[in-house]
Amino acid sequence: RHPHVFGDGTAATVSQVRAAWQTIKQQEKPARASQLEGIPKALPELARAARLSSRAALVGYDFPDRLMLFEKLREELGELAVELFGTPELPVVIPSAETAAVPDEPWTDAARRERAESELGDVLFAVANIARRWGINPEEALRKTNARFTRRFQAIETAVRESGRTLQQVSLPEMESIYQAYKRREQGRADASADTQ
């Protein structure tokens, strides 16, 4: 399968090597009905999205410039905003006592909720595609973010408990202040660790 190394083939670029590799693999394997066959449905969905877009890219269905993926993400966020807010413009929210007291609206229109879910799926697919193009595992990125959030939220719980109060007795701005302080401490430890290496 490596004619550019062991045979008569030549390949000047990495993309030419990959294209030749795919051609040889397709000749050796039975024909697939779809380029997307063989991607396990049991994969976590972010990983599956990255794999689907990777397979499509192998046959040229990809943005020629990876920066275009951010424009696609903006487009998808705009479409989600239309379903959520009735406008493609993302709202700018300035926190205040009034906005903090407004409860989330329950979905009253099932069709609109379904469209919003579809648009959110498109946003997540675009994010997985960005991860793929930059060589980032989206599942690993999300796992690390979940772990960071857990540590930081638990820091809020600890600080509140040590103050003799419950979470329900603490304002959102105070909780956010504790969260951000813990985040700065974590980043300071990471910076100090990097300096010693």
Region spans (language model):
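Flexible "arm" and connector segments at domain edges
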Residues: 1-120, 125-197
